[in-house]
A protein has these predicted regions:
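Short glycine-enriched nucleophile-adjacent loop
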Residues: 100-110
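The feature captures the conserved acid-bearing segment of alpha/beta-hydrolase catalytic domains
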Residues: 115-200
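Core-facing hydrophobic residues within beta-strands of well-ordered domains
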Residues: 88, 113-114
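A domain-start/cap signature at the N-terminus of enzymes
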Residues: 1-27, 59
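Alpha/beta-hydrolase fold nucleophile elbow
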Residues: 85-97
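Active-site machinery of serine-nucleophile hydrolases
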Residues: 25-84
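Catalytic nucleophile serine of serine hydrolases
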Residues: 95-100, 120
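Surface-exposed acidic, glycine-flexible loop patches that form ligand/cofactor-binding
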Residues: 17-23, 50-54, 81-87, 133-140, ...
Length: 201
């Protein structure tokens, strides 16, 4: 039973199974990075299983193409599509690799997200400083989860974000764990549970 989805220029949007024939509006989790269609379907299926097991709220999952303007995509998606509760308390972000730069630009723009997960982030010292400044400027701080492979050559960057968040006394999670069979989404459920606890339905 495949999840209903909508393809736009820069994103693929999957609705919860409960959304069919419903007028209810749902929170939305944006995921940006190199994720093929097969991976998306696996992640959506895992997410729906978590919903069925009452581990998480039903939500819209929006997979945004890598290296596209995230702020613009969010604006387009939430204007064009129905069934989305577009507010900071209902919006979260998972960003992979060098897409953290698009993430930072979106975070800087306005109070967009209630929670942010950065996975194997690629960036420099400026990016780290910009991320901290951006989340610090929020009226309501979006909690951050930083996930990095222990052997990653970008370990220093994620570690730097962790240190800066700690120095700013901003509550966050920092994880450095090996992935199973090179699957970057090994800890997908952990990230969803973390964001679920931030979303206020």
């Amino acid at each position: 039973n495949e999840a209903p989805f909508i393809q736009t220029a820069n994103a693929t949007v999957y609705y919860p199974e409960q959304a069919q024939g419903s007028t209810r509006k749902y929170p939305i989790i944006y995921v940006q990075g190199e994720i093929n269609e097969q991976q998306q379907k696996v992640l959506v299926s895992q997410f729906h299983q978590m919903v069925d097991e009452n581990k998480t709220w039903p939500a819209v999952l929006c997979f945004v193409k890598a290296n596209t303007d995230l702020s613009e995509t969010i604006s387009d998606i939430e204007k064009q599509l129905s069934g989305i509760r577009g507010s900071q308390r209902m919006r979260a972000l998972i960003t992979l690799g060098d897409n953290i730069k698009e993430g930072i630009e979106a975070i800087q723009g306005e109070n967009l997200f209630t929670g942010i997960v950065c996975v194997n982030a690629i960036g420099n010292e400026n990016d780290a400083q910009n991320l901290i400044k951006a989340v610090n400027s929020y009226k309501r701080y979006p909690r951050c989860w930083i996930e990095i492979l222990p052997e990653s050559k970008e370990y220093g960057f994620s570690s730097n974000i962790h240190i800066l968040l700690k120095e700013s006394d901003l509550e966050h999670e920092f994880r450095s764990r090996k992935c199973k069979e090179a699957n970057v989404f090994t800890y997908w459920e952990d990230w969803i549970l973390y964001l679920n606890n931030r979303i206020h339905v």
